[in-house]
Design a protein with these regions (language model features):
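N-terminal glycine/serine-rich phosphate-binding loop of ATP-dependent small-molecule kinases
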Residues: 1-4, 8-87
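Gly/Thr-rich phosphate-binding beta-strand-loop-beta motif of the actin/hexokinase/Hsp70
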Residues: 1-24, 112, 118-140, 156
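Fold-independent oxyanion-binding glycine-rich loops
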Residues: 8, 57-58, 83-85, 104, ...
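Conserved active-site and cofactor/substrate-binding residues in soluble primary-metabolism enzymes
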Residues: 34, 62, 100-107, 151
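A short alpha->loop->secondary-structure connector
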Residues: 72-75, 139-143
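Acidic-glycine-rich active-site phosphate/pyrophosphate-binding loop
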Residues: 77-90, 127, 161-172
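Conserved phosphate-binding catalytic cores of ATP/NTP-utilizing and phosphoryl-transfer enzymes
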Residues: 87-120
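Active-site rim beta-loop-alpha module in soluble metabolic enzymes
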Residues: 139, 146-175
Length: 175
């Protein structure tokens, strides 16, 4: 089964084409590029024939709705959005209200636990940095969200006097 996997983040959309359990191709496009060049900045890189589209979205419902519509036209397939659950894929959600856990954190833990099947500290560094702990049984023990490198750099330089940040802007972008 060919599946198109979409990670709709706050800064970028990352995608991967999976054939069974194997990732065949990947790509990324920034929201800025889509604003400047149009949605073709994403679709020209994507396959047209897939059996399923799975998406993880933290960028809001407006963009999710737009991407879902475009994917339906491009691939003639509905987009299925992942949501955190009480348990799934070997992970037990540590939140009393499972959907309060960010879906990006949920899928990062699922992927890490599927790969390593042991106690883990899962770190995802993007626009924000998320850190989550899993025990060896896959129980989510809790986590933290902190600003990403660019947000921290911007806060320091705009809210303080006399601090010079010597990280080039091009290196301060999320992966």
């Amino acid at each position: 089964m060919r599946a198109l996997l979409l990670d709709i983040g706050n800064t970028r959309i990352k995608w991967g084409l999976a054939d069974g359990a194997k990732l065949q191709r990947t790509g990324t496009v920034t929201h800025e590029k889509i604003r400047d060049a149009g949605i073709a900045a994403l679709t020209t890189r994507l396959p047209r024939r897939v059996d399923r589209i799975l998406a993880c979205n933290v960028a809001g419902t407006s963009l999710a709705t737009r991407i879902s519509g475009v994917m339906h036209l491009h691939c003639d397939t509905d987009t299925h959005f992942v949501h955190p659950a009480r348990a799934g894929f070997g992970i037990t959600n540590g939140y009393g209200r499972p959907r309060r856990l960010g879906v990006d954190r949920w899928v990062a833990m699922i992927g890490a636990y599927a790969e390593f099947s042991r106690a883990l500290c899962v770190v995802d560094a993007g626009t924000a940095v998320t850190i989550d702990a899993l025990d060896r049984q896959g129980q989510h023990l809790g986590g933290q969200i902190i600003p990403g490198l660019r947000m921290m750099q911007d806060a320091l330089t705009s809210e303080t006097d006399g601090i010079e940040v010597d990280i080039p802007r091009s290196r301060a972008r999320p992966a």
